[in-house]
Amino acid sequence: MAYAKLGRTSSQRKALLRDLVTDLIINERIETTEAKAKELRPIVEKMITLGKRGDLHARRQAAAFVRNEIADVESGQDAIQKLFADIAPRFAERQGGYTRILKVGPRRGDGAPMAIIEFV
């Protein structure tokens, strides 16, 4: 299995990707480095596929990965509820390819190539 190490240990990498997945579900668009965006894409696609399945086991699998954060303060909806209620139904007719990565300029400071990852 090929993956980028992202300059971190395996536990740090898993924590980073969990945070990025949760942020993407909540905000639907985040700016990060290209390498992180490319690593994030397959994980987010799997989460949306779980959301489309919608059964109890899929919900528990998604809840085991996505952080328990409030997505919408007014409705009190958390990230998992948003994934299953808002995002997954939007892609009901789509077979994969739920995200797009847009390259933006290098980051000021260290010149790291940046990208925006968002839902289609």
Curated annotation (Swiss-Prot):
Top-rank lineage group of the source organism: Bacteria
GO cellular component term of the entry, any: cytosolic large ribosomal subunit
MF-aspect GO terms: structural constituent of ribosome
Listed Pfam families: Ribosomal_L17
SUPFAM superfamilies given in the database record: Prokaryotic ribosomal protein L17 (SSF64263)
Gene Ontology biological process: translation
Keyword Membrane: no
InterPro entries referenced in this protein's UniProt entry, alphabetically: Ribosomal_bL17 (IPR000456), Ribosomal_bL17_CS (IPR047859), Ribosomal_bL17_sf (IPR036373)
Keyword tags: Ribonucleoprotein, Ribosomal protein
Family: Belongs to the bacterial ribosomal protein bL17 family.
Subunit-structure text: Part of the 50S ribosomal subunit. Contacts protein L32.
Protein name: Large ribosomal subunit protein bL17
Organism annotation: Shouchella clausii (strain KSM-K16) (Alkalihalobacillus clausii)
